[in-house]
Amino acid sequence: MRDWYYADHRDLLKWGVLVLLARRHRLSRIVQIAYLRPSIFPRIDLGGQETELPSQVRTHFRDINNIAALRDELLISVFDRVFDDRKAYQDAAMRYLSNLASEPRLVFLDPDTGLEPAERPDLKHVLDAEAHAIWSELKTKEVFAFYQHKTNRAGRPWIEEKRIQLEKALKAKEGTVQVGKSMKIANDVVIFYAVKS
């Protein structure tokens, strides 16, 4: 996820769904695999003199680790390594998850856009095989959640197509992957989720 977009209306939907799922399934921890890609923030013009955005302001409004302070009975862990090398990132994320395997978890994959497209996936996407590898490491009754942004601008339905793609990527039986959404909060985003059986 780009830090530029942290704490917008999509995060209200995202974290609302995640907290509700964790409560529903009596999980004590949410682990966010952030796929962090830091942004270069624009400069501020003060009377014709350009200057950097103060780091304290940027940190206050755009630090993805701020979610860990959510006042709830849940523990929230954020894997915030910079996502710039796909293999190294996946290996490190798998190690991170194995270190947090002692308690029931909801593991949330949070890329910029979502699942890989049919052609030319890039760092905005999670590959099907990467999603499957993480799903495979979950224990029974743990929850897998996945951020998916709208995939087309032509107005065609997109949610079911991506839901089926994720289900196939996970090699899960039909109907395993469900959808969390609120078209009134963020109509261009859904959170897919599945409970490991």
Residue spans of the language-model regions?
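Class I S-adenosyl-L-methionine-dependent methyltransferase catalytic core
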Residues: 1-197
